[in-house]
């Protein structure tokens, strides 16, 4: 579970950046 969170963190960050780009 911990590893999944670590992997999802950058993914969510990237999505946040994409949304900000819109």
UniProtKB/Swiss-Prot annotation:
Domain of life of the native organism: Eukaryota
Modified residues (Leucine amide): 22
GO CC, alphabetical: extracellular region
Keyword Secreted among record annotations: yes
Protein name (database record): Rothein 2.2
Main localization, broad class: secreted
Function comment: Lacks antimicrobial activity. Does not inhibit the formation of NO by neuronal nitric oxide.
Tissues of expression: Expressed by the skin dorsal glands.
UniProt-annotated location(s): Secreted
Keywords assigned: Amidation, Amphibian defense peptide, Secreted
Family named by the database record: Belongs to the frog skin active peptide (FSAP) family. Rothein subfamily.
GO biological process: defense response
């Amino acid at each position: 579970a911990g590893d999944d969170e670590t992997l999802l963190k950058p993914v969510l960050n990237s999505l946040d950046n994409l949304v900000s780009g819109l």
